[in-house]
From Swiss-Prot:
GO terms for biological process: mRNA catabolic process. Residues 325-418 form the HD domain. Coiled coil: none annotated. It is found in: Cell membrane. GO terms for molecular function: RNA binding; RNA endonuclease activity. It comes from Treponema denticola (strain ATCC 35405 / DSM 14222 / CIP 103919 / JCM 8153 / KCTC 15104). GO terms for cellular component: plasma membrane. Keywords: Cell membrane, Endonuclease, Hydrolase, Membrane, Nuclease, RNA-binding, Transmembrane, Transmembrane helix. It is a single-pass membrane protein. This is Ribonuclease Y. Residues 199-284 form the KH domain. Its main location: membrane. Belongs to the RNase Y family. CDD domains: HDc, KH-I_RNaseY.
Length: 509
């Protein structure tokens, strides 16, 4: 019995619980359906309200657009009416103009008819006058036309020649003025040292006893110094001085410096001489390179081959007519650069060509060519621009200049060399040049005496008034000047002045 209770009671409880759960679920479902139905009804009402609101807004928008369209239509109709009124006014004005043009056309037709009538009359008169002119002049119309053309042609040629001469004169004056302006501007901008160092070859001695020490026992010291440096040491009767002679300026400088140091040191023997010479040689070699680099830096020139730099540096120890060649080359480069900038040429090419124009004087070679040819070969070897090579070779007209920069280098070289005080001659050459100048003038027939004055810049010639007349003086002066140009070399120009004096003496008794 008990087991029945234990089995049936739980079963009844389970069934009762499931039934209660089912009934609760049905109740919940019914409530959810009612809530959903209520929400749906509310949504339908809201949708209807929004629909009515949208329809109302749409109607209001349509009404506004209709009013806007009507307003625009009224404005367009108003514009169209105004346009039609203006068009009507223009048509009225055009009709008036057409009437005016028609009247003018009729008037022109009348005038044209009158002109045609007058033209016929004038043509007849012209033919009659032409026949009368031909009868009076004895020339046909074609002959008269040819005569007039010839006269006009001659007059036109004369006018053309006059105009051409005027243009040539103006061009010459303009060119001279422009050249003067360029040179004046260049010289005003040029600021270089006018005084150059004198490369001396005389070594001062503390006393004449030092000469014996320099010579050494059986001349071994002087032989060692001459052998190591390649110079000639001249010891003569000149008190307290020794002369160093050599054609190579660098070797002469090495010998001079080495000799001065030996004298200062006091130890003079072959071993010491060799040591000093080697040391000075290294120092001079370094100085050569430094001088070359210095001038390149001063001029703003870059990318120069080392061989070219050394050749430039060697010019520091070389002089020409007392002018330092490196300083001269630097000055020529500055002048060439200024001229090139004034006329629009290549400044870099002009400066390089001007700086290297005398580089052949510093080249280490035994060639018998002149310095322009040697310099041109050196410029080719160091891979310079062909225009630079041409400028170097053509600066003394040994070859034909092929570019404007070569001509600029020639001009700059002439300016630097001709500048007063830039160069000087030795006394012997100076006296000889003056003597040659006077002898050349005295070789002409009728010349009594010639005097070279103002350092050879002027030649005054006294002539015999019985052999040379006033009319012949101009010819003689020109002949003397031409012979000076052909036979002598001189800087600048020489003024030839002829003096012819006639003295007539009479006595009254």
């Amino acid at each position: 019995m008990n087991w029945i209770l234990y089995v049936i009671l739980p079963a009844v409880c389970i069934i009762l619980g499931w039934t209660i759960r089912w009934l609760y679920a049905r109740f919940q479902l019914s409530a959810s359906e009612q809530r959903a139905e209520r929400i749906l009804q509310e949504a339908i009402k809201d949708a209807e309200a929004q629909k009515k609101e949208f329809l109302l807004e749409a109607k209001e928008q349509l009404i506004r657009e209709q009013k806007q369209q009507e307003r625009e239509n009224r404005e367009r109709r108003s514009d169209l009416q105004r346009f039609e009124r203006r068009l009507a006014q223009k048509e009225e004005v055009l009709d008036k103009r057409v009437e005016t043009v028609e009247k003018q056309e009729k008037e022109l037709i009348k005038r044209e008819a009158a002109l045609d009538e007058r033209t016929e009359i004038l043509s007849g008169e012209e033919e009659r006058y032409r026949e009368e002119l031909e009868r009076i002049s004895g020339l046909t119309q074609q002959q008269a036309k040819d005569l007039i053309i010839r006269d006009l042609e001659a007059e036109a040629k004369h006018d053309a020649v006059t105009i051409i001469n005027k243009i040539e004169q103006e061009a010459q004056l303009t060119a001279e003025k422009k050249a003067q302006d360029i040179l004046i501007t260049t010289i005003q901008r040029l600021a270089t040292e006018t005084a150059s160092d004198i490369t001396v070859s005389t070594v001062s001695l503390p006393s004449d006893e030092m000469k014996g020490r320099i010579i050494g026992r059986e001349g071994r010291n002087i032989r060692a110094l001459e052998t190591l440096t390649g110079v000639d040491i001249i010891i003569d009767d000149t008190p307290e001085a020794v002369v160093v002679s050599c054609f190579d300026p660098v070797r002469k400088e090495i010998a001079r410096v080495a000799l001065e140091r030996l004298i200062l040191d006091g130890r003079i023997h072959p071993a010491r001489i060799e040591e000093i010479v080697q040391k000075v040689t290294r120092e001079i070699s370094q100085k050569v390179y430094e001088e070359g680099e210095k001038v390149l830096f001063d001029l703003g020139i870059h990318n120069m081959n080392q061989e070219g730099v050394r050749a430039l540096g060697r010019l520091y120890f070389r002089t020409s007519y007392g002018q330092n060649v490196l300083q001269h080359s630097k000055e020529v480069a500055i002048i060439a650069g200024m001229i090139a900038s004034e006329i629009g040429a290549n400044v870099e090419i002009a400066k390089r060509g001007a700086l290297l124009h005398d580089i052949g004087k510093g080249a280490e070679t035994d060639s018998d060519k002149n310095h322009a040819e040697i310099g041109m070969e050196l410029a080719k070897r160091i891979n310079e621009d062909p225009r630079v090579v041409n400028a170097v070779g053509a600066h003394h007209n040994d070859i034909e200049p092929t570019c404007i920069e070569s001509v600029i280098v020639q001009i700059a070289d002439a300016i630097s060399a001709a500048r007063p005080g830039a160069r000087r001659e030795t006394m012997d050459n100076y006296v000889k040049r003056l003597e040659n100048l006077e002898q050349l003038a005295e070789g002409f027939n009728g010349v009594e005496k010639a005097y070279a004055i103002q350092a050879g810049r002027e030649l005054r010639v006294v002539i015999n008034n019985e052999k040379i007349s006033d009319a012949d003086t101009k010819i003689l002066a020109r002949d003397i000047a031409k012979k000076i140009e052909n036979d002598l070399q001189y800087p600048g120009r020489i003024r030839v002045t002829l003096i012819r004096e006639t003295r007539i003496v009479e006595y009254a008794r």
